[in-house]
């Protein structure tokens, strides 16, 4: 089966499934580094050629760089999306040398001459000054040839507008988006459509909650087995609670049985079918589910399927506000589980 592709810009095409890298950074069980690199080759050979990582995903940029080096025949067809997320404690006092140091470090780690896409985030756009000026330095590095394209992640629509109005050329936005978390729909997607900014969505499988394994199960409570489940359990609570989520899983299971696919693929197909969505990011610690995930390209949700899902989704409370507003509140229950200072440069790098 062929993997759907998406034209982000006239000169840049990606796979509509993106291999996520957060799960390789720790907090999701043991990672066999050698096997993880071999698995990357499996993804690329099967058509998932686009990888997502970040400057602060511990060890992941290096893994991708080692994969590129050890698989020279595959490296030319791979697209790598990394991030620039300055530490919270640095905000308001960031120098050009610090920004360029992080970008140069990503180039070294990934073993490339230029970064395909740098997705930018600033932890406190409203409380700590400088997020537009910092993005303009990324634009300077783009002009200098170190960055091919600039994207953003986890800004709300007002903040994204400030970046665009400030002269930052934004190609993509990475929001959290799923049937349970539809915050991008009210403002972010309409604005992005008007500016030709493409959505590359994460959280599409709720960290593993969108599987048949959870159907009919009692509500789980802390401590959960990994950070993803902790994060997305809060989203389920905001959606309307475990009971309503079970209704959604039941509807998805029925649809999946009809098309001979899993609950996860129903959720994934729903996201891929939304306006302005270029791709969905699926985190993986191994390649064991890759063949199953590719089945998302073998079916379509018909009118009856959409009505069945809408019947449940119409009952939801949904998380409040615009994209990432809840998570940005350090005193709130979403913000309290975030890690804000994971991007310290190596001691030999620039300050």
Model-found features: residue ranges?
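N-terminal binding-site loop/beta-alpha segment at the start of enzyme catalytic domains
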Residues: 1-78, 351
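Terminal-tail/helix-coil boundary detector
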Residues: 2, 194, 222-254, 258, ...
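Structural preference for beta-strand elements that scaffold enzyme active sites
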Residues: 7, 14-18, 49-50, 77-81, ...
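Aromatic-lined glycan-binding groove of carbohydrate-active enzymes
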Residues: 12, 184-227, 262
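Conserved, mostly hydrophobic/aromatic
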Residues: 19, 51, 64, 80, ...
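Active-site beta-loop-alpha junctions enriched in small/polar residues
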Residues: 22-24, 54-56, 83-87, 120-123, ...
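Acidic-and-aromatic substrate-binding clefts and catalytic sites of carbohydrate-active enzymes
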Residues: 27-31, 54-63, 87-90, 125-129, ...
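Glycine/proline-rich, positively charged
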Residues: 45, 90-187, 198
């Amino acid at each position: 089966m062929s993997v759907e592709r998406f034209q982000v810009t006239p000169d840049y095409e990606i796979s509509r499934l993106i291999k996520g890298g957060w799960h390789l950074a720790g907090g999701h069980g043991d990672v066999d580094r050698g096997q993880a690199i071999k698995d990357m080759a499996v993804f690329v050979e099967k058509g998932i050629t686009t990888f997502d990582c970040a400057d602060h995903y511990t060890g992941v940029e290096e893994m991708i760089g080692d994969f590129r080096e050890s698989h020279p025949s595959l490296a030319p067809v791979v697209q790598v999306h990394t991030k620039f997320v300055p530490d919270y404690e640095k905000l308001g006092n960031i120098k050009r040398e610090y920004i360029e140091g992080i970008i140069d470090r990503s180039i070294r780690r990934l073993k490339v001459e230029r970064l395909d896409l740098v997705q930018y985030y600033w932890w406190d756009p409203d409380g700590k000054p400088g997020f537009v000026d910092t993005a303009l330095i990324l634009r300077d590095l783009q002009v200098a040839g170190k960055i091919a394209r600039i994207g953003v992640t986890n800004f709300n629509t007002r903040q994204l507008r400030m970046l665009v109005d400030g002269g930052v050329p934004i190609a993509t936005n990475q929001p959290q988006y799923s049937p349970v978390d539809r915050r991008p729909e009210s403002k972010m997607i309409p604005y992005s459509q008007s500016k030709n900014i493409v959505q590359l969505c994460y959280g599409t499988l709720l960290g593993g909650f969108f599987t048949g394994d959870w159907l009919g199960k009692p509500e789980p409570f802390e401590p959960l087995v990994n950070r993803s489940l902790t994060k997305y359990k809060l989203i389920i609570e905001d959606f309307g609670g475990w009971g309503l989520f079970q209704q959604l899983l039941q509807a998805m299971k029925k649809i999946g049985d009809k098309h001979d696919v899993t609950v996860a693929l129903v959720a994934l197909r729903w996201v891929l079918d939304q306006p302005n969505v270029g791709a969905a990011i699926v985190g993986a610690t191994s390649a064991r589910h890759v063949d199953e995930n590719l089945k998302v390209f073998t079916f379509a949700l018909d009118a009856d399927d959409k009505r069945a899902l809408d019947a449940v989704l119409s009952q939801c409370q949904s998380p409040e506000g615009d994209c990432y507003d809840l998570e940005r509140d350090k005193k709130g229950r979403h913000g309290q589980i975030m890690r804000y200072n994971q991007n310290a440069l190596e001691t030999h790098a620039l300050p």
